[in-house]
Every structure is written in C-alpha cells, then in structure tokens.
C-alpha cells in the first residue's frame, strides 16, 4: 500500500506528493498572490486616508506615560501642493500618553544645603543619593523615594499621603500617615494623622528646626499641633470654629487663586518656636453656585462657593495670628494703622520669618515680615511682628514720577534676610527712564524702621529673589532679561557690603544653547543653585551650579539628545516694531520642509494678561506642535503691551483700561507678520485664546470685524469684568465706583452685533469656579439676540481647565479650523 504521507513546510504551506501535491502547490501560489494584492491595496488605501478621524472615539487619555518613542507617521498633508510629504505628529499621538523628550526633573534641597534628585516619570531610583554642600560627589542617602520628600527636619520620621478629594487648583484633602526612619530605612509600623483613623487632612507642616519632628496640620479647617509623631491622640487643637466659610491655616478660593497661589497659609519660624497662620472669613461674602450633574440624583447638585466680585462691599476678611509654642499663647497681629481704618479691605500678600539683625536685638531673635496691601493693591506695607508687638518697617506706594501701577503678589514673595535687614523686589526708576522691578535692600535700625539703601538690577524686571548668602555675600534672582524669549538666573557677588558697582552674571551664558530656564532655585544656604536648561525639541538639562564659581557646575541629567520621531517644525523668535512704539516679541512655528512660495494659514494663540509672558525659547506645547505638524499651518505666540518683564513702559498701558492696548498691538502684530513673512496667507488667519486670552479674542473679533482675523476661538472667556473676582480685577482696574468707564470698556456683551464677517467658536465649562459660565451664558445670549451665527461648546461638570474633556475640545477646535476656517479647495478633510 502507498502511503499518503506529506511534509509540512516551515513557511506554513503544505506540499503534497503526486497529483494532490500539484493541486496543493497551485492553491498555495494563488493564495500568496491574493495576499500580496490585498497588501498592496491596503498600503495604497492607508496613504489615501485623512490624517485623523475626529469622529472616532478611541478613548485616549492624556497621561504621563513612559519614554518610548512615538512611531513616525507619514501622512498626506492638508495643503499638498504647498508641502512635501513628511513625518508628522498626529492628533492620535498627541493623546497616546507617549513622550518624546524629558522636560523636567524633580529634586529637593535638604536644610543643610544638600541636593537630592527625586524619582520622576522616567527613572526609578531605589537608592536615593545626595550631593552635600561643598561637594560634587553623590553619596547614599535614603532607600525610599516615596518618603524622601516628606522627611521630618531631624530625618527620624516621614509622612505618606493619599489624595482623596481634589478641591481647587492648588488644594486637596488627603489621608496622612507617619512612618519611622531607622538607619535610612522605613519602618513597617504606621501612625495615622488626625483625630481619627481616617481623618481628612488639608495641610501638613513639619517643624523646620533641624532637631525637631513635631508638626502642625489642618483638619476640618482648624489648626492642630502634634508633638510626638507616634501619638496622634496627643494632638492639641489650636483653633476652634473652623468651617468651609471660616478657615484657619488654609487659603480660601480667592487667596489660593489670586494672592498666595497656594493653599498653604501657615508659616513656622526657623527656630520652631513660633507658628503664624491666617484666618479667612467668608461668612459675609456673596456666594456662587456651581452645578454638578450625576446619575445618582434626579436633581442638579449645587456647590456653594464664596466668591467676592469686583466692587462688592464684603470682601474676604483676613486675620493673622502667631502661636508661641513655649508659652502656648496665641496673639493676633494687627495690620498697619493705615489699613485698620479700611474695615478689613486689605490683603496679606506674603509672610516670611527672618532672624533679626544684631542691631535689632531689642526686637527679639525672630520676627515675621508681613507684606500687606490696600484693596486696590497699589500701596504695600512691610511690618515686623512677634508675639509681643508689630512695628512698621516700610511703606511703599506704587507711584513714581506721576506714573502709577499695581503690585503683583508674586513680586514680593521672595523675602530674604541680610545681616542688617532684608531683600525684596520693588519698582525703581532706571537710567533709561523706564521703571523696572529691582531688588531692594531694606536696612533696619534698632527700632525696626527700615529704609531702602541699595537697588540691584538692570534694564529688565526682576521676577523673584531666589536666595541670598550672608556668608559669601551673594544674591541670586530670576529675570527674563532683555532678550526675546529668555528666562535666566542672575548672580550678584559682593551684593550688599561692597562699595563697588554691582555686576550681574547671567547663568545661562555658562551653557550652550540655553536661553530659557525651567525650574530654578537656590539651596537654603544660598550657596548653590539648580537650573534646568530648556532647549527647543531636546531633553532638558539639569545642572547643579556653585554660586561663587559657576565653572564648578555638574550636569546631572539631559546629556543625551531627544529622539524626535517626526520632522521638527521650524521655530523662529524675534521682535517687530509696532506703531505703539514698543517691540512686539514673538515665537512662530512653521511646518518642516516648507516650500518656497508656499502660502499657509496662521493661528495666533494669545493670552496677553497683565504682567504675563508667552514667548519662551523652549519646546512649545504638544498641541501647538501637533497642529503645525499635521495640518501645515503657522502657529504664533506674542508679547505686546501689558505683558511682563520689560518695565512700566510696557505694562502701564493697560492699567485701569484692560482690553484696549493689547487688542491694538495684537492686530498690528498680525499686520507685521503679513508684511514680514511671505508664507502667511492673509485670507486665512485665526486667533485663539483661553481665559484672559478668550476675553481678548472676543475684543479682537469685535474691533476687527473680519478685516484681518477671519476666525476667532474663545475658550472660558471673561466677557464682563464685573463678573470676575475682586482681587484680580481691582488690581488692574481699580474700584468700579472710581473707574466706571474702565469697567464699561471691558464688557463685550453690548457689542455682540459687531462679531460679523468672522467665524466664531465659544467653549466653556459649566462648573468653572474661576471664570464662571455666567460669562459665556450672557455672551452667547447676546450673540443669539443679534442673529450672529457661531459655534458653542458647553462642557457639563468641567472646571476652568476643561482637563477631562481636552480630547473632545481639541478635536472640535481643529475641526473648526480645518473644515470651517481654513477651508481650501485642496485636499479637504
């Protein structure tokens, strides 16, 4: 009998012997041919597809994934006759969670000046190392990255936390526990924080004294003190009567958002003897009600939020206290007499404990420097307080040579002691006639009265004092400098006690291709700084730098170049002279491989808020890169009148008249772009803005009426500043009763009929605690009443950032731009 045996090839085709084998081989050949044909058609079909399908719901989440490279994608460009085929960064990749470069490194300073680099999204460090002060060599420090940021001052305990409830931009509620540290190892035993096992803790602060491990915390809006970390039942309640509308040690919405830019309102003294804290009384403040829609309730839920608006009589009432831990005594520190008569209409801008100079020994060893401001925020007062009394150190009005401006809380946030007084930032007239924020040395006499004895700065605004070391007499501060898109740390040696003219060293000059610094800080001793150099489309570089000798620098991270899986857009920085007399600064992205003679649309992304800055020489936002790369358009950001870094000559144009100079300069910048860059298609120009930028976008649409700007995208805009909060609005506009016309001019609602010849998109979250949906509700109603065609997106349960709906928002914005605004006869989506 003949066997019907057959062999099976490794390739997967069976080959039979005899007639059956011939038939089988024929079938196999036909099958392979069919597969090849299908493959060829699949490739052709793939390249004929539009870049993205915004109608599909792929469930992408914007997360901070790993470092694996994005896969390069070759797509047919939107305007194919203008561009060569190139590798593109797509909408799907934008929300893939994958990262193509490292833009930030986390670190901490220890109280002795040692540097410790933290775990981050890209590196897992089981063994933490530190670089001690005066050394360049890393040594073992701690074996647990989870707790290293939470060590007690004596490093014998640490806390762990788990977020339970998100509150506002900077605040949340947590479950805390304490662990013990033995030989730099975490114990298994834990102790809870709070009166009960699962108490929600709103803030936690270790005693900063190097030999201490006691702490204070905030629970249910009251402040507690605990001496022994292992005995939660021994905690002492320092305040009573705390509630949502009467907070101790925890900022209310207004202070968290507009004054402190943090939820923290507790300050330990360096010795650990004193604790100062603020009380925020909103019981008489008007409320807003934020809606929440759920499946659990057939009725709408409303959250009640105290929110003082511009011009209201009852603003937040703030009171300051000092607790003396030795005498267990709490005293209230009174505001300056000039403010006491204002019936609580004042602000506490910042607090900083300092060791008193030797000639002020009668004032005690430590005093709290408090910076107070009147309600209009154009007059500040520096007081020195302890548990016995307060003395006025300095009063400073923001009026120089009949010119007036506001104080920004961030300007005075960096207060540092010297041997004879303290340093802060205040405005000062420069040799060029402009008025800039400079470092001021306030020298104190034996009574605590101060006077400014020295100014340090050049022809640009100082942003923040980072540190000062009396030991080496060296000052460090951050500033934008006088270049376009720059941000650097500056070092001043022989800063206080030399008769020589002070000279400034720009730290970024020490590094190649480093014009903009990200995070920058000085160690607690003021003798070393950490800077993070941001270079466009490359990994950020992390440096540890010696203040005395900047050649002694260590690059800790960022030595490898980023691998970018798409063709990098071209990036331009520059300035253009405007009719207003100032130089408008800009950053512009254009597609890679842009052909000569090409004409492409322009999207101008604006913010423009007072004292803000948008132009930086660093990697743009991922959204900006994607929209340029995928759709072959130009994207720009600008800094014009009203923005920060260049003194009063630029800023003061918007004081008490928001929405005027910024709009004029923005339109003039667009004209200058058209005249300067031949690739811009003047018939396809769009402006987009969020928050204050949304306000300016609407103002531009009203003023321009489609002459230059064909499309406007306004996201979460202010439409009438009487709807916005008191602290921000009155800082720039003053009181409505004193500047009624200034407020009237910010109201876009009566001008809805002028939004003509422009395609308009409006988006807003209904649960926006910052810029209330009331703004867009009134604005859209006016547009409807005037018969204006526009597109509106309303996001239920979303706050100001729309963070949970960005996939949808960006998709709709891009659909609006490409299908409605930049519509072309070429290769439409």
Curated annotation (Swiss-Prot):
It is found in: Cell membrane. Glycans are attached at residues 61, 66, 183, 209, 314, 359, 754. GO terms for molecular function: aminopeptidase activity; dipeptidyl-peptidase activity; serine-type peptidase activity. The active site is at residues 691, 768, 800. GO terms for biological process: proteolysis. It is an enzyme of class 3 (hydrolase). The keyword Ribonucleoprotein does not apply. GO terms for cellular component: plasma membrane. The keyword Transmembrane helix applies. Keywords: Aminopeptidase, Cell membrane, Disulfide bond, Glycoprotein, Hydrolase, Membrane, Protease, Serine protease, Signal-anchor, Transmembrane, Transmembrane helix. The chain crosses the membrane at residues 28-48. Residues 1-27 are cytoplasmic. SUPFAM superfamilies: alpha/beta-Hydrolases, DPP6 N-terminal domain-like. It holds the Pfam family DPPIV_N. Disulfide bonds join 514-533, 711-821. It is a single-pass type II membrane protein. Its EC number is 3.4.14.-. Residues 49-829 are extracellular. Gene3D superfamilies: alpha/beta hydrolase, Dipeptidylpeptidase IV, N-terminal domain. Belongs to the peptidase S9B family. DPPIV subfamily. Removes N-terminal dipeptides sequentially from polypeptides. Essential for control of distal tip cell migration. PANTHER family: DIPEPTIDYL PEPTIDASE FAMILY MEMBER 2 (PTHR11731:SF202), PROTEASE FAMILY S9B,C DIPEPTIDYL-PEPTIDASE IV-RELATED (PTHR11731). This is Dipeptidyl peptidase family member 2.
């Amino acid at each position: 009998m003949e066997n019907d045996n057959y062999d099976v090839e490794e390739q997967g085709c069976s080959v039979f012997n005899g007639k059956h084998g011939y038939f089988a081989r024929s079938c196999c050949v036909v099958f392979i041919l069919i597969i090849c044909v299908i493959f060829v058609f699949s490739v052709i079909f793939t390249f004929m597809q539009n870049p993205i399908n915004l109608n599909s719901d792929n469930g992408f989440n914007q997360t901070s994934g790993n470092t694996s490279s994005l896969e390069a994608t070759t797509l047919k460009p939107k305007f194919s006759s203008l561009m060569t085929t190139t590798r593109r960064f797509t909408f799907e990749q934008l929300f893939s969670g994958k990262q193509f470069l490292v833009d930030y490194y986390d670190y901490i300073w220890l109280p002795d000046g040692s540097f410790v680099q933290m775990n981050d999204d890209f590196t897992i460090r089981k063994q933490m190392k530190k670089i001690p002060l005066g050394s360049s060599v890393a040594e073992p420090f701690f074996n647990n990255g989870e707790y290293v940021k939470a060590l007690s001052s004596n490093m014998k305990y640490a806390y762990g936390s788990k977020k339970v409830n998100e509150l506002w931009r900077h605040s949340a509620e947590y479950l805390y526990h304490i662990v013990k540290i033995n030989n730099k190892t975490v114990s298994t035993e834990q102790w809870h924080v709070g009166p009960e096992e699962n108490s929600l803790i709103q803030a936690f602060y270790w005693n900063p004294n190097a030999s201490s491990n006691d702490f204070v915390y905030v629970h249910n809006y009251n402040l507690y003190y605990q001496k022994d970390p292992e005995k939660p039942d021994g905690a002492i309640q320092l305040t009573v009567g705390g509630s949502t509308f009467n907070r101790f040690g925890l900022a209310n919405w207004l202070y968290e958002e507009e004054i402190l830019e943090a939820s923290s309102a507790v300050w330990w003294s360096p010795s650990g003897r004193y604790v100062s804290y603020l009380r925020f009384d909103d019981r008489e403040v008007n409320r807003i009600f934020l809606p929440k829609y759920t499946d659990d309730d057939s009725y709408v839920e409303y959250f009640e939020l105290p929110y003082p608006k511009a011009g209201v009589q009852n603003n937040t009432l703030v009171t300051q206290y000092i607790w003396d831990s030795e005498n267990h005594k709490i005293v209230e520190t009174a505001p300056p007499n000039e403010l006491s008569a204002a019936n609580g209409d004042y602000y506490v801008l910042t607090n900083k404990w300092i060791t008193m100079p030797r000639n002020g020994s009668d004032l005690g060893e430590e005093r709290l420097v408090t910076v107070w401001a009147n309600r209009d925020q154009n007059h500040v007062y520096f007081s020195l307080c302890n548990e016995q009394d307060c003395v006025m150190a300095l009063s400073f009005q923001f009026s120089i040579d009949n010119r007036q401006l506001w104080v920004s809380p961030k300007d005075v946030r960096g207060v540092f002691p010297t041997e004879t007084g303290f340093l802060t930032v205040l405005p000062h007239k420069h040799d060029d006639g402009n008025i800039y924020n400079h470092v001021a040395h306030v020298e104190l006499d034996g009574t605590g009265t101060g006077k400014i004895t020295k100014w340090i700065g050049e022809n640009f605004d100082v942003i923040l004092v980072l540190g000062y070391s009396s030991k080496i007499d060296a000052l460090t501060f951050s500033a934008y400098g006088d270049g376009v898109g720059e941000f650097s740390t500056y070092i001043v040696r022989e800063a206080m006690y030399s008769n020589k003219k002070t000279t400034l060293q720009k730290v970024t000059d020490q590094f190649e291709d480093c014009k903009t610094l990200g995070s920058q800080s000085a160690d607690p001793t003021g003798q070393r700084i950490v800077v993070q150099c941001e270079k466009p489309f490359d990994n950020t570089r992390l440096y540890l730098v010696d203040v005395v000798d900047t050649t002694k620098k260590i690059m800790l991270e960022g030595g490898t170049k980023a691998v970018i899986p798409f063709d990098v857009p071209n990036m331009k920085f520059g300035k253009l002279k405007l009719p207003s007399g100032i130089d408008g600064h800009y950053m512009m992205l254009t597609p890679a491989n842009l052909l000569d003679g090409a004409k492409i649309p322009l999207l101008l992304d604006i913010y423009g808020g007072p004292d803000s800055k948008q132009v930086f020489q660093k990697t743009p936002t991922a959204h900006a890169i994607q929209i340029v790369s995928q759709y072959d358009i130009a994207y720009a950001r600008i800094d014009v009148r009203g923005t920060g870094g260049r003194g009063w000559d630029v800023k003061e144009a918007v004081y008490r008249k928001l929405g005027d100079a910024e709009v004029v300069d923005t339109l003039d910048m667009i004209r200058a772009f058209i005249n300067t860059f031949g690739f811009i298609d003047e018939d396809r120009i769009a402006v987009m803005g969020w928050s204050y930028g949304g306000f300016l976008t609407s103002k531009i649409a009203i003023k321009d009426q489609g002459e230059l700007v064909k499309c406007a995208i306004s996201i979460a805009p202010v439409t009438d500043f009487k709807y916005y909060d008191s602290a921000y609005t009155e800082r720039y506009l003053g009181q409505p009763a004193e500047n009624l016309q200034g407020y009237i001019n910010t109201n876009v609602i009566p001008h809805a009929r002028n939004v003509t010849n422009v395609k308009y998109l409006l988006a807003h979250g209904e649960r926006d605690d910052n810029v209330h949906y009331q703004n867009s509700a009134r604005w859209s109603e006016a547009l409807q009443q005037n018969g204006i065609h526009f597109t509106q997106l309303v996001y239920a349960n979303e706050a100001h950032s729309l963070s949970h709906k960005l996939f949808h928002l960006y998709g709709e914005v891009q659909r609006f731009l490409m299908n409605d605004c930049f519509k072309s006869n070429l290769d439409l989506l």
